[in-house]
């Protein structure tokens, strides 16, 4: 059962109830707290575009706690983050794995963060296909091209050489927040806001 908390605010016109995500959106905060599929990507992209229309000069914060998911859905979010005018700050809470880690690294340089006990995991794209040999060959070429694209972007975002990215993403590569900072996936580990 998925319970979404409601927040009640007092206004000069009385009380107003929001689901917690709508209330956070008012403060330019977007939550990515699930696996990434087309529906999730469409929702995140719509929120990014809405916040750009509201104020193109004000930063957006994207909090990430995601095991990853669809490459094409994740790339829709990535491309939108790069396309819009506001800087998108990324913050890892819990786990940013696979496409979640990719989106974490996609935040504006200097504005990519992780909480101290969060984890980041990078790896090569996963895929599986069935069918005729020629179709399997087509899908194999496609996933290899995707791997090259993802590795190239990660190299640009982290400052790591492409060969190092290819080696480090060959298998599941788990990192603490501090290791992710050293690697260049994030810029800072947030200790406290107090």
Curated annotation (Swiss-Prot):
Protein name per its UniProtKB record: ATP-dependent Clp protease proteolytic subunit 1
General function of this protein: Cleaves peptides in various proteins in a process that requires ATP hydrolysis. Has a chymotrypsin-like activity. Plays a major role in the degradation of misfolded proteins. ClpXP1 is involved in the complete degradation of the Site-2 clipped anti-sigma-W factor RsiW. This results in the release of SigW and the transcription activation of the genes under the control of the sigma-W factor.
UniProt keyword terms in alphabetical order: Cytoplasm, Hydrolase, Protease, Serine protease
GO MF annotation terms: ATP-dependent peptidase activity; ATPase binding; serine-type endopeptidase activity
Family assignment from sequence similarity: Belongs to the peptidase S14 family.
Leading EC class: hydrolase
The species this protein was found in: Halalkalibacterium halodurans (strain ATCC BAA-125 / DSM 18197 / FERM 7344 / JCM 9153 / C-125) (Bacillus halodurans)
Subunit structure: Fourteen ClpP subunits assemble into 2 heptameric rings which stack back to back to give a disk-like structure with a central cavity, resembling the structure of eukaryotic proteasomes.
GO biological process assignments: protein quality control for misfolded or incompletely synthesized proteins
Taxonomic lineage from the root: Bacteria, Bacillati, Bacillota, Bacilli, Bacillales
InterPro entries: ClpP, ClpP/crotonase-like_dom_sf, ClpP/TepA, ClpP_His_AS, ClpP_Ser_AS
Main location: cytoplasm
Annotated compartments: Cytoplasm
EC number: 3.4.21.92
Keyword Membrane included in the entry's annotation: no
Active site: 98 (nucleophile), 123
Annotated gene: clpP1
HAMAP family: ClpP
PROSITE patterns the record matches: CLP_PROTEASE_HIS (PS00382), CLP_PROTEASE_SER (PS00381)
Pfam families (UniProt xref): CLP_protease
Gene Ontology CC, one term: endopeptidase Clp complex
Reactions accelerated catalytically: Hydrolysis of proteins to small peptides in the presence of ATP and magnesium. alpha-casein is the usual test substrate. In the absence of ATP, only oligopeptides shorter than five residues are hydrolyzed (such as succinyl-Leu-Tyr-|-NHMec, and Leu-Tyr-Leu-|-Tyr-Trp, in which cleavage of the -Tyr-|-Leu- and -Tyr-|-Trp bonds also occurs)
